[in-house]
Structures are given as structure tokens and as C-alpha cells.
Swiss-Prot record:
Chain's gene name: eno
Keyword S-adenosyl-L-methionine set for record: no
Metal-binding recorded as keyword: yes
Gene3D superfamilies for this protein: Enolase-like C-terminal domain, Enolase-like, N-terminal domain
Primary location recorded for the protein, binned into one broad class: cytoplasm
The protein's name: Enolase
Annotated function: Catalyzes the reversible conversion of 2-phosphoglycerate (2-PG) into phosphoenolpyruvate (PEP). It is essential for the degradation of carbohydrates via glycolysis.
PANTHER family: ENOLASE
Length: 431
């Protein structure tokens, strides 16, 4: 097998994501006829420090959300630069893409254009070598199946309802294999639907497949989930824990946290009190973006108060960016990073962020976006890097289920080598 296999063509197109907005899909063609394809996700609640997602802004087409400019950047500018390069040299190709753009935030070509190419290159290389993507990226040590962080009640920017907190999730930590954990999550999901129905709540779903009922309070979301866990025959605090994505930057206004639906306006210290009360009352194991992306002091306070008890995940805070993560590590802020490929824009930079987190003793949670496609790259990525946790929505809506199904296939392929760490995925928390 050749050690240098040329890229002979790169083709991008505009396709639709799960929220009915356009996104970029890229195909990379190799000299032997091999093809690699990747589609790029898109977020609803986005951090201000994320790499730039290039949109057309033409209100007459897709409400201004078209990506024809990004597609043209791939087909014209990027293709010309990477045709002839060795598909097996991912780091060099990603470096070429970054330099070709020339901006700090990938605002010239668009992170959606660059990421589509970066991921399609990796997929083409894996296909050429005849190996699964997770093995191509991670090598022989890629064997850890992740604990799912399943979003089963949606609020905030992901739903049109009365809940301020964006995501309420279940984590099946008390099981010894991935497939059994997924089954338990599915059973809790169905039990939750019945529970909501019995209380007269809507069972319509949000962007990520979770239910989006008009609950009486944010806390009621946790309470109905705990009820559903028990109805499904499982024990909260043993087999299942709760994870929350507060997405607090969305309700951070003039230095205060405004929980509109609860009629509360809180200081950073009061917001920490709010979450500490929940942690003491409920089996919560993870809180994402509990403080706003600009509130470093609030983050510091939250980490001091809760950092040994629960996983504190930085999403908008870190945006998969090694510079911001380095600052957080130096300040002793958070203890985990959310990994979103399109926040930074290349596979290589994503892997660098995960490596930095691991060296600092931070966990890494590989994540989808609210606007997804059938692309399953993140399922392979989470196994490739042995991250141990994945956040990819409810066990509903095919763009979410596609990732779980890919993980089920990987689990089967790995066989006895596969590991499911359960509670041990939270290696930096007090037991």
C-alpha cells in the first residue's frame, strides 16, 4: 500500500441539516477511486469565541442562512490548494487549510468550509487504508465506548417552552457495557413520555430529540426525570445520574443571571448557590456552562465550591480552543471541556484540545450540535480518543440516533476489547 496517495478532487455542496437550514457537505476523491465524505453541524446557542460559520446573508434564500459562499470557497480556493497533497498527512493538510484562511477565527473561508474538508480528508484516508475512522484516528488503543449524556428534556434555545435551563440529561453510569446503557436510556425515555402524558404535559420534542414541555419550574424537569428513571426500573444516584447544560450565557444580562420563567435575577454567587442547592438535593454529576463565557470570576467561584463534587464542563467558555482552555487551566477554572469540531474548525486542532485537557486532568466530552446531519464522525472520534463521554441528544430523531447506532456497531466490532467505564469516566471527581 502506497505511503503517498494523492487527493485528485474536492467537491462541496449545500445540503440540509436537522433544523432545515443549509450546511456544507464535502467529498474528497483519491487517485485510486476512494472517496471520503463529511457533513458539518451547526449550533443554536453559540459561544462568541467560536470559529466563524460562514453564511450568505441573502434573505431571499433560506432566510439568509445559505452556505453557497462556503461551498464556493471549498470548490474554488481550497480545492486548488489541496489537490495533489497526500491524504495520509492530516496534520499538514489541516495546517495548509489554517494558513490559507489566514485569520484567527477562520472568518475568511469559514470554519464550515474548512471543517468539511478536514473531516472528509480523514474519512478518505481511513477508507483508503480499509480501516474504521476511529482506528485511523486513534490507532490500536482506541477502545473506550462513551457514557452517553442523553438530552431528554429540552429548554432554552433548543425549545419553545417555559424552561430556562437548556438541557436536562441522563447519564447511565451504573452499567458494564455500552449496549446495555443505551437500552436503559431508551427505556427511561419511553417512561418519561408516559410520565409527562400522565401529568398533562406536551410530548413534542425539541431540536435534539428531548421533550419540550411547559413545566412549572426548572427543578420540575429534574423531578419528572427522576420519576421516569424509577418507573423504568432503575435507581437514580446509582445506575443513572443527571447532567445539565445551563447555557447560562443565553440568560446572562448586564452582569446578572436572569431566569425569566422563574422571575429571578441572580448574581454570580447566587447562581452558584442555586446550582449547589440542586447538587445537594438531586443526583447531579455534571453541569455544563453553569456560568457565562465572560464571567471568569463566577466560574472560579463555582469551581471552588463544586469542582470536587461534579463535572463542570466548559463549552462557550472554552469553545474547543487551546488558548482559552490554557487560560482556564492556569486559573483553575472548570474541570472538563466540551469538544465540538465546528467550534475550532479542523480535526488536528480538535485533537490538540483533547490532548491538552487530558494532560491537565480535565475530562473531555465529545459533542454534537443542535443542527445535525446523518454524519457520524463524532461517534468515531469519541472512541478514537478514549474520551469516555459523548453528548449527542436523545435516543430519538435519526440524526441523533445515527451516532448511537454507529457506537453500537463499533462496540460490536471491538468485541471483548471494548471498555465501558461508567462512573470511572469521571476520573477527576471524588468518589
Amino acid at each position: 500500500m502506497k505511503q503517498y496517495i494523492e487527493i485528485i478532487d474536492v467537491v462541496a455542496r449545500q445540503i440540509l441539516d436537522s433544523r432545515c437550514f443549509p450546511t456544507v457537505e464535502v467529498e474528497v476523491y483519491l487517485e485510486d477511486g476512494t472517496v471520503g465524505r463529511a457533513a458539518v453541524p451547526s449550533g443554536a446557542s453559540t459561544g462568541i469565541y467560536e470559529a466563524v460559520e460562514l453564511r450568505d446573508g441573502d434573505k431571499d434564500k433560506y432566510l439568509g442562512k445559505g452556505v453557497e459562499k462556503a461551498v464556493a470557497n471549498v470548490n474554488d480556493t481550497i480545492a486548488e490548494e489541496i489537490i495533489g497533497l497526500n491524504v495520509l498527512d492530516q496534520a499538514y493538510i489541516d495546517k495548509t487549510l489554517i494558513e490559507l484562511d489566514g485569520t484567527k477565527n477562520k472568518g475568511k473561508l469559514g470554519a464550515n468550509a474548512i471543517l468539511g474538508v478536514s473531516l472528509a480528508v480523514a474519512q478518505a484516508a481511513a477508507n483508503y487504508l480499509g480501516m474504521p475512522l476511529y482506528q485511523y484516528i486513534g490507532g490500536v488503543n482506541a477502545k473506550v465506548l462513551p457514557v452517553p449524556m442523553m438530552n431528554i428534556i429540552n429548554g432554552g434555545s433548543h425549545a419553545d417552552n417555559s424552561v430556562d435551563i437548556q438541557e436536562f440529561m441522563i447519564m447511565p453510569v451504573g452499567f458494564d457495557c455500552f449496549e446495555r446503557a443505551v437500552r436503559a436510556c431508551a427505556e427511561v425515555y419511553h417512561a418519561l413520555k408516559k410520565t409527562l402524558n400522565s401529568k398533562g404535559y406536551s410530548t413534542g420534542v425539541g431540536d435534539e430529540g428531548g421533550f419540550a414541555p411547559n413545566l412549572k419550574s426548572n427543578a420540575e424537569a429534574i423531578e419528572v426525570i427522576l420519576e421516569a428513571i424509577e418507573k423504568a426500573g432503575y435507581e437514580p444516584g446509582k445506575e443513572f445520574f443527571i447532567a445539565i447544560d445551563a447555557a447560562s450565557s443565553e440568560y446572562y444580562k448586564d452582569g446578572k443571571y436572569v431566569l425569566e420563567h422563574e422571575g429571578k435575577t441572580l448574581t454570580a454567587a447566587e447562581m452558584v448557590d442555586f446550582f449547589e442547592d440542586w447538587v445537594n438535593k438531586y443526583p447531579i454529576i455534571s453541569i455544563e456552562d453553569g456560568m457565562a463565557e465572560e464571567d471568569w470570576e463566577g466560574w472560579k467561584l463555582m469551581t471552588e465550591r463544586l469542582g470536587k463534587k461534579v463535572q463542570l464542563v466548559g463549552d462557550d467558555l472554552f469553545v474547543t480552543n487551546t488558548e482559552r482552555l490554557k487560560t482556564g487551566i492556569e486559573k483553575g477554572i472548570a474541570n472538563s471541556i466540551l469538544i465540538k469540531l465546528n467550534q475550532i474548525g479542523t480535526l488536528t486542532e480538535t485533537l490538540n484540545a483533547i490532548e491538552m485537557a487530558n494532560r491537565a486532568g480535565y475530562t473531555a466530552v465529545v459533542s454534537h450540535r443542535s443542527g445535525e446531519t446523518e454524519d457520524t464522525t463524532i461517534a468515531d472520534l469519541v472512541v478514537a480518543v478514549n474520551a469516555g463521554q459523548i453528548k449527542t441528544g436523545a435516543p430519538a430523531r435519526s440524526e441523533r440516533v445515527a451516532k448511537y447506532n454507529q457506537l453500537i456497531r463499533i462496540n460490536e466490532e471491538l468485541g471483548e476489547v471494548a471498555e465501558y467505564r461508567g462512573r470511572n469516566a469521571f476520573f477527576n471527581l471524588s468518589k
